[in-house]
Amino acid sequence: MVDVFFTDTAWYVGQIFFLVLSCVIFLIFVVALLATIKLCIQICGFCNIFIISPSAYVYNRGRQLYKSYSEHVIPSTLDDLI
C-alpha cells in the first residue's frame, strides 16, 4: 500500500499551479506582443491615410492647376514689361 502524505500532495498541486501560472503569464506576454505588432501596423496605416495620401493629392492637384493655368494664361513679352 502506498502512503500518501499531505506534503507530497501539496507539492504536486504546487507544481501544477506553477505550470498553469507560467503558461498564463507566457500567454499574456504573447498576446501583448501581438497587440503591439497590430498597433504598429495600424499606426503605419494611419500614417499612410493622414500623411502620404493627402500630400500625394495636394501634389497632383497642384500640378493639374499649374498645367491649366499655364494653358490659359498668355505669357507676357518683354515689350510689355518695358
UniProtKB/Swiss-Prot annotation:
Topological domain spans for side Virion surface: 1-16
Stretches assigned to the Intravirion side: 38-78
Keywords: Apoptosis, Host Golgi apparatus, Host membrane, Membrane, Transmembrane, Transmembrane helix
Pfam families in UniProt: CoV_E
One biological process term in Gene Ontology: disruption of cellular anatomical structure in another organism
Position of the signal peptide: none
Transmembrane segments: 17-37
Subcellular location: Host Golgi apparatus membrane
Annotated InterPro entries: E_protein_bCoV, E_protein_CoV
Cellular component terms (Gene Ontology): host cell Golgi membrane; membrane
Membrane topology label: Single-pass type III membrane protein
General remark: Isolate N5 belongs to genotype C. Genotype C probably arose from recombination between genotypes A and B.
Oligomeric and partner information: Homopentamer. Interacts with membrane protein M in the budding compartment of the host cell, which is located between endoplasmic reticulum and the Golgi complex. Interacts with Nucleoprotein.
Role, per record: Plays a central role in virus morphogenesis and assembly. Acts as a viroporin and self-assembles in host membranes forming pentameric protein-lipid pores that allow ion transport. Also plays a role in the induction of apoptosis.
Family from the record: Belongs to the betacoronaviruses E protein family.
Protein name per its UniProtKB record: Envelope small membrane protein
Organism: Human coronavirus HKU1 (isolate N5)
Gene name for this UniProt entry: E
